[in-house]
């Protein structure tokens, strides 16, 4: 007979007699790595008796003894019913050959194990400092990214190809290689941040922003043609304020990039940058357009503005509305909102307005804490990954401070991320009515990772669903009622609007503060 051997692991099955109970046998399968060649096996015939195997009776071959360089196999050729099994008898030679085979098997398994372990290792050639930084970025995404198909590509193969083909001789070339890698994910929120931008982003979530001190939003019909982004406010004493930029001015360009197609999320990133760096703005004030070059600096940001507004009435019995404008979710946001609520409740407010228009988000934990102020119980948000719900954020009411007063939440297409979580939680728990237009639809959650050279990665690690299990990504939170385009955009204008019963803030008055 011929045995066709290959370089792969080949199965050899045999049945081992059970000496304790002859009526039962043990089926054994060995995987033997055979050499890549064809070898002739020896063939011997033996007579078969119940007591022994005789070599002298060749005329009645009951057993065929087949050997190759690894194993000797005894096949029964008699007509007794054997259920198709091949019986193995051990002999001195067989035991010796079996021992050799087992040694080879162990060697093969050891080699195979080593191969498996080293599959995830970088290529064997020498790695430079730039290569190692690229690998650090690759590993960060590999471990944290929500989509484990990596946009349908082989993430391991991309690593090997990039290390072989992408130039990484300088830090700038390495940054470019990392950006190209991130771009293959086709995720606008997973992005690479050079050291200056990473530092600016981190400081922005800590209550201070290295920028020009502007709060921006989308234009409304009352602002005229949508030819850019509108200035909501300029931080007192900040670069924009000192340059004479006023609320209502339109930003038409940032560093030679038109803002007509920019989201406020992208524009906010462009306005921030390393302290001391310059940014050029094209500002339209009325009919005049100015080009201003501003120097970025650290600007303290108070994320909350609030005001107690009285409706026309009879003196101290006039209904009072507490207006809270939340512009961002930095690490001061929850404490500032708590302080505003407690101050307004101390003045016996009858209802609240929480204005989240043009709030592009920020710190996820701050959004969760603020939701707890308004809810006596319930789910705030579900955190989901590719396998389903991963975590649940809820409240038992222990942090609630304003659960009884009617609440209206104002949103628009500039309401994104953490502010959408807050609006969705208050809506789905029937705590508030939501007014405005569908929100931005940023239903993904990012974590920020610092790399060894001070640069960083913002990586999408999860998505969220509202308490009603609504996935708002690219769809947004749908409001309960529309809001007039001319509705006031800040606390002073809102209080002034309430003094005029014919103004926009009196439209839907029967609904605005109802539960």
Swiss-Prot record:
Cell compartment(s), UniProt: Plastid, Chloroplast thylakoid lumen
Any one GO BP annotation for this protein: proteolysis
Bridged cysteine pairs (disulfide): none
Pfam families assigned: PDZ_6, Peptidase_S41
Reaction(s) the record says it catalyses: The enzyme shows specific recognition of a C-terminal tripeptide, Xaa-Yaa-Zaa, in which Xaa is preferably Ala or Leu, Yaa is preferably Ala or Tyr, and Zaa is preferably Ala, but then cleaves at a variable distance from the C-terminus. A typical cleavage is -Ala-Ala-|-Arg-Ala-Ala-Lys-Glu-Asn-Tyr-Ala-Leu-Ala-Ala
A GO molecular-function annotation: peptidase activity
PROSITE patterns in alphabetical order: PDZ
Domain PDZ: 198-286
GO CC aspect terms: chloroplast thylakoid lumen; mitochondrion; thylakoid; thylakoid lumen
NCBIfam families (UniProt xref): prc (TIGR00225)
Similarity comment: Belongs to the peptidase S41A family.
Protein name (Swiss-Prot/TrEMBL): Carboxyl-terminal-processing peptidase 2, chloroplastic
């Amino acid at each position: 007979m011929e045995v066709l051997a290959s370089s792969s692991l080949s199965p050899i099955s045999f049945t081992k007699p059970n000496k304790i109970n002859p009526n039962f046998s043990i089926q054994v399968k060995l995987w033997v790595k055979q050499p890549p060649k064809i070898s002739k096996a020896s063939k011997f015939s033996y007579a078969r008796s119940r007591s022994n195997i005789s070599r002298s009776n060749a005329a009645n071959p009951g057993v065929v003894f087949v050997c190759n360089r690894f194993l000797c196999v005894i096949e029964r050729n008699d007509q007794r019913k054997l259920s198709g099994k091949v019986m193995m008898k051990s002999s001195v030679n067989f035991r010796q050959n079996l021992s050799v085979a087992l040694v080879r098997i162990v060697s093969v398994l050891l080699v195979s194990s080593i191969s498996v372990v080293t599959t995830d290792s970088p290529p064997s050639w020498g790695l430079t400092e730039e290569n190692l930084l690229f690998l650090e970025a690759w590993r960060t995404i590999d471990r944290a990214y929500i989509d484990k198909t990596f946009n349908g590509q082989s993430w391991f193969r991309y690593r090997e190809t990039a290390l072989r083909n992408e130039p990484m001789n300088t830090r700038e070339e390495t940054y470019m290689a990392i950006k190209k890698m991130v771009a293959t994910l086709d995720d606008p929120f997973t992005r690479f941040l050079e050291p200056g931008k990473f530092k600016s982003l981190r400081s922005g979530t800590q209550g201070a922003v290295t920028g020009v001190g502007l709060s921006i939003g989308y234009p409304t019909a009352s602002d005229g043609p949508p030819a850019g982004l509108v200035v909501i406010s300029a931080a007192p004493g900040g670069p924009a304020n000192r340059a004479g930029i006023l609320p209502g001015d339109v930003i038409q360009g940032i560093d030679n990039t038109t803002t007509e197609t920019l989201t406020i999320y992208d524009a906010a990133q462009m306005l921030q940058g390393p302290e001391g760096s310059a940014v050029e703005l094209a500002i339209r004030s009325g009919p005049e357009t100015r080009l201003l070059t501003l120097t970025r600096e650290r600007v303290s940001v108070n994320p909350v503005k609030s005001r107690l507004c009285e409706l026309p009435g009879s003196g101290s019995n006039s209904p009072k509305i507490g207006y809270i404008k939340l512009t961002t979710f930095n690490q001061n946001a929850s404490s500032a909102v708590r302080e505003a609520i407690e101050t307004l409740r101390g003045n016996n407010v009858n209802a609240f307005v929480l204005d989240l228009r043009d709030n592009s988000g920020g710190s996820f934990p701050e959004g969760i804490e603020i939701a707890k102020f308004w809810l006596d119980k319930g789910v705030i948000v579900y955190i989901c990954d590719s396998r389903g719900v991963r975590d649940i954020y809820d409240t038992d009411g222990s942090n609630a401070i304003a659960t009884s007063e009617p609440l209206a939440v104002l949103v628009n297409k500039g309401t994104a991320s953490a502010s959408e979580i807050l609006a969705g939680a208050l809506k789905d728990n029937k705590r508030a009515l939501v007014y405005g237009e569908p929100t931005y639809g940023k239903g993904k959650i990012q974590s920020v990772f610092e790399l060894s050279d001070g640069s960083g990665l913002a990586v999408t690690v999860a998505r969220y669903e509202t308490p009603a299990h609504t996935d708002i990504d690219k769809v947004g939170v749908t409001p309960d009622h529309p809001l007039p385009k001319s509705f006031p955009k800040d606390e002073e204008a809102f209080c002034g609007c309430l003094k005029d019963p014919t103004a926009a803030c009196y439209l839907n008055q029967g609904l605005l503060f109802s539960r």
